């Protein structure tokens, strides 16, 4: 069976850091394909690069505007802000911020579990139960599994909606799963509005129509 290679983007303004990260990830070279990028000047442009590249995970340095060797422009955001912005568009997507300034990065990041100290990739993993690159691959696998499970659960709910019907909780869950998959999969098309329409809303609409009808007769 052919091994699946995960595509990982690494963002840093220094070429030396690109080389260091590539050397580090060589330990699991059979499992990943790493592409190093310099940060774009604006966060919107950087996000568009991500959309075009379609990676399985993103690893970014926290400081993206510190060393001006390879880039000559100012980068208006840091790695934590970049990850926060991308995960607003793609909830739970595997993203990681590596830094020497862990306190600043943690205070900026919306999820402290995304922040890792650089020393972990410079000999600081001795004795660790799980190395950083293993955690990256693990998070990718978990994310993909969550998508598969969401698709399966959504299929069951759609079938049940056209059969015995859904409870209010299940109707909310159907909308939640649909939204998650729409943000997670480029190939996914959102469900038609009639499928997501709640029975409670339909009932409310019927009540309003009847009230309007009664008021019209009284008038």
Question: Which ranges hold each PLM region?
Answer:
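Conserved acidic segment of CheY-like receiver
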Residues: 3-26
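Acidic, metal-coordinating helix/loop segments flanking the phosphotransfer/catalytic sites
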Residues: 37-57, 65
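Receiver (REC) domain switch-region micro-motif
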Residues: 58-60, 86
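Short, flexible/disordered intra-domain loops and linkers
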Residues: 64-78
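A short, hydrophobic beta-strand element within the central beta-sheet of small alpha/beta folds
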Residues: 81-105
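As written
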Residues: 108-120
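Receiver (REC) domain switch/output surface
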Residues: 119-157
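C-terminal output/effector regions of signal-responsive regulators
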Residues: 141-219
């Amino acid at each position: 069976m052919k091994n699946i290679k995960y595509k990982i983007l690494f963002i840093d303004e220094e070429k030396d850091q690109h080389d260091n990260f590539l050397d580090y990830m060589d330990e699991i070279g059979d499992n990943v394909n790493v592409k190093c990028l310099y940060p774009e000047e604006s966060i919107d442009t950087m996000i568009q690069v991500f959309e075009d590249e379609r990676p399985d995970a993103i690893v970014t340095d926290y400081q993206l505007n510190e060393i001006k060797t390879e880039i000559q422009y100012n980068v208006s955001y840091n790695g934590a802000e970049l990850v926060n912005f991308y995960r607003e568009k793609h909830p739970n997507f595997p993203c990681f911020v590596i830094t020497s300034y862990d306190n600043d990065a943690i205070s900026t990041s919306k999820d402290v579990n995304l922040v890792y100290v650089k020393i972990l990739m410079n000999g600081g993993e001795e004795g660790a139960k799980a190395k950083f690159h293993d955690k990256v691959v693990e998070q990718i696998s978990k994310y993909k599994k969550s998508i598969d499970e969401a698709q399966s659960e959504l299929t069951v709910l759609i079938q049940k909606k056209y059969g015995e019907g859904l409870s209010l909780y299940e109707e909310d869950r159907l909308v939640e799963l649909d939204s998650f998959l729409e943000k997670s999969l480029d190939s996914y098309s959102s469900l038609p509005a009639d499928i997501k329409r709640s029975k409670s809303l339909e009932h409310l609409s019927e009540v309003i129509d009847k009230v309007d009808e009664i008021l019209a007769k009284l008038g």
